[in-house]
Amino acid sequence: MNLSPAQNFLEAIRFGSPEYMPRGNEDIFHTLQIKNNFFYGNWTDQWGVNWVMDMPDTSPFPKVNPLPDITKLDDYKIPNPDDLFTDMDEEKRKVKKAKAEGKLVICGMSYFLFERAWAVMGLENFLVALIEEPELSHILLRKIALYAKRVFENMLELGADMISFSEDLGTQRALAFSPEHFHEFFLPEYRVAFEDTLKAKKIINFHSCGCVESIVHSLADINVSMLNPIQSRANDIKKIKEITTNKMALSGAIDSHLLLVGTTKEVRDETARVIEILKPGGGYICAPDQGFPEYPPENIDMLYKTAVELGRY
């Protein structure tokens, strides 16, 4: 068929007929930048969360939480999502150019629902609120979901083919809360936030680090298009593949720890092992399960050489 890389990617994540397994290093995306979404430095976002970068070349972390007590929710003002999308004429021109070049346009939002709630409240405060103040927790999460829904609407209006966001739900061993809490508090709000994106048949790229194998079936059931990064040391990737085949694509799964400290032979063997599990039937984008600038170049080179060698369908 001689598909373009972007067309091949779409065939793969839709469980169609890709010519090869897509790879994370392919130049097929244009990233649409929205203003005041996230900065690498010390800053205060539109929610009133103060971010501090404790070490150079790392991500800042929420240090001041504007709503530590959820019983004060009535006094807390949710920001206007449209404020992220002012003065976008230059970005519109870039989107038009990217689409003319055959690229897919991706637009991302940092700190989606769970992450946004705990950034606003503080992690411990929010987890306690889920148990002690469930009604107020539902109200807060619905407010955040409606904010996100409007953000996604704006992204689509600007021409986004894919929406992405960070929503780390897992620790190394399990979810940060019970699966029951996930289904009660979070899954209904995902449905609200994704409504327009699903109607527009655009791609939902869901990012969650940690162990998420207990909820991947639910993410697939609400039509999440793709899940990343599938941390291999936190999840049973065979189990996840069985659950998501023909339902939800997977991206990542190549052990980042091994990429950092392993030999090229170990990297090749691990990449081949993961490809053997995740490639069959489509729906897999081969990439590291975390992004680090310190990866030895020879290991990254081996990863993608192996992916090319073993990637044909």
For the regions a language model picked out, list residue spans one by one.
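Active-site loop segments of alpha/beta catalytic cores
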Residues: 1-24, 28, 78-313
